[in-house]
Amino acid sequence: MDEEKLPCELHKEGSATQEDHGLEPEEEPGLQNGTAASEGLSSHISGPGGEKTLEGTMEPVRGPDVALPGLNLSLTNGLALGQDGNILEDSIEFKTWRSGPAEEEDVPGSPCPDAGDPQLGLDCPGEPDVRDGFSATFEKILESELLRGTQYSSLDSLDVLSLTDESDSCVSFEAPLTPLIQQRARDSPEAGAGLGNGDMGPEGDLGATGGCDGELGSPLRRSISSSRSENVLSHLSLTSVPNGFHEDGPGGSGGDDEDDEDTDKLLNSASDTSLKDGLSDSDSELSSSEGLEPGSTDPLANGCQGVSEAARRLARRLYHLEGFQRCDVARQLGKNNEFSRLVAGEYLSFFDFSGLTLDRALRTFLKAFPLMGETQERERVLTHFSRRYCQCNPDDSTSEDGIHTLTCALMLLNTDLHGHNIGKKMSCQQFIANLDQLNDGQDFAKDLLKTLYNSIKNEKLEWAIDEDELRKSLSELVDDKFGTGTKKVTRILDGGNPFLDVPQALNATTYKHGVLTRKTHADMDGKRTPRGRRGWKKFYAVLKGTILYLQKDEYRLDKALSEGDLKNAIRVHHALATRASDYSKKSNVLKLKTADWRVFLFQAPSKEEMLSWILRINLVAAIFSAPAFPAAVSSMKKFCRPLLPSCTTRLCQEEQLRSHENKLRQVTAELAEHRCHPLERGLKSKEAEEYRLKEHYLTFEKSRYETYIHLLAVKIKVGSDDLERIEARLATIEGDDPALRKTHSSPALSLGHGPVTGSKATKDTSASDT
């Protein structure tokens, strides 16, 4: 074979090329932007069969690599060729592709027609190599980098993909193939077998019709995800496998059976469920993607198209909850990176807010997932919602910033009107005044603001609750092993302190129920209740377990507790009920002081009912209140009340009685010691207040334990859980009106931890059946 060496010159595109049968190695000059070669990205080709061994794998891959013309490559930092990246090229004029402007220079070559390149390990036993050296080298670099990369399939791994901006971490350049190499790729039988139908158009673009009719079958087999930008590359003979290995693609005559078998291997080799879903979806998505011309200004060019496709797939799976939970949606949409913004845009495209008012659109959006996370994360999610609402309603005169302002205002209004905060609720005039000049320097329409205010006031915003969060909610029923039986328990929220909740048995014994009129006299820690909340309100009271429920409707066994009933519920553990002798405006009034020192006044229909309520509340508290914890030890002189446990005691009645007696002796001793050090003259007002507070606490505790001991001793002496017998015994001892014996509401008392001796205990059978 005659060989001819031609000088290599750089010239503009479109210059004539000359054919020659010989190949000579040329050294590739480095990129002008100074990008260093990445270590460990080299690959070598050895053996007469064209066997390639890629670094990072143990499995050889065979088959020719044919580069497509017009291919746009996007490489991450560090993928530029080094000094050892030689390129095999014909003895013709060619153009060196660089990221900077091209400069014409002569590149000397050395004739090497039959010998292989020692650095690339290429042996030339006489058969021609149809691959362009420039493209083959870059394909080997890309394959090696892709093998070292990680397949991004899960929600967490996608976070890594979006850590850096695409524009900051990529060096983009275009490398269209020369007409000579294009002609060789079309004429070669190996290349034709690898290309299949529709993979290379007449102009060198990636075909848009490369569906399942080609030799390679599904476009899935030409889809290789990069570790940074998920570039979609045309890979003619290799099949991407999620675990990092490759399988040989079918040859020139691969059938449909082989294609299906290879695809099954792909899906079965994936270890992540979400990755399998992503691979199975890529057939329909990538088959319609068209290649871009060199120099295209499409914003999805140079690797961004792969990221956009990944964001679209993830958004679809988040919307349909395929492999994700509802709580994962807000966590992904609320992140502050470019990829999460792409995902949010694709996710919001599933919602159509056309023709909806802002409050209705917001309700629809919030029902899809729970809006969780920190304030800035939730604000980002609402920003995406506002943008989508403006896209669906282009005729709305309000700007996107104005819609976002109104959305945040509605969220705050919902919290103010329907939250557990104590204080005066926001009025409509205050809502309008708070939004003055926030519509791009102008005011919102008052009719619009009034409509939105009334909508939120009449119907609060509700969003979806995740299944895991539902188990932890205040109204979720769970099974709790207690004693010898299984009880249904719920989380009862104390309206005075929303941060403390206690499990209560729904099938607990009902000790008394009847009509009571309530007045709130003091809030937590004895603070005076504001005047606007001191009014008398009539309720139907139910003493069930250690909870006093105040219902607006009459008590029924088959009726479930509403949210309002739970808000008004009062826990009577460590509480003390007495006659309100210092209150003379109404008759038959009892005073209830709870463990957190809240004070309530209740008016009963008659004196007998008042005394019955006092007896049963105190008796339940005496039997079921757990022993108090020791007081905290501190160097501060400020007095602090000890924490009283809200759980049910595990002691029997005799042990409970001894515990109360020991506590009474301790409190009595502390009170005597406290009174041995009276106030000194000239004592500061703050110290005097601390002294009086401690004395008041010890006096109250002494009175409470005396009442507990008296009632519990009578109950043990009677030897029955029949509350009528206990009331009669107490009336005889105290010489009170015997009419106390004629109460007819739940006349029995039973312990949750021991056998019931009385036969008149009433149980909430409907709750136990559920």
Curated annotation (Swiss-Prot):
Biased composition regions of type Low complexity, renumbered to the chain: 216-234, 285-296
Any one of the GO CC terms: ruffle membrane
MF GO annotations: guanyl-nucleotide exchange factor activity; phospholipid binding
SUPFAM superfamilies: PH domain-like, Sec7 domain
GO-annotated biological processes: regulation of ARF protein signal transduction
Transmembrane residue ranges: 619-636
Superkingdom field: Eukaryota
Membrane topology: Single-pass membrane protein
The SEC7 domain, residue ranges: 256-459
InterPro entries the record matches: PH-like_dom_sf, PH_9, PH_dom-spectrin-type, PH_domain, Sec7_C_sf, Sec7_dom, Sec7_dom_sf
Record protein name field: PH and SEC7 domain-containing protein 2
Source organism per UniProt: Mus musculus (Mouse)
Top-level taxonomy: Eukaryota, Metazoa, Chordata, Craniata, Vertebrata
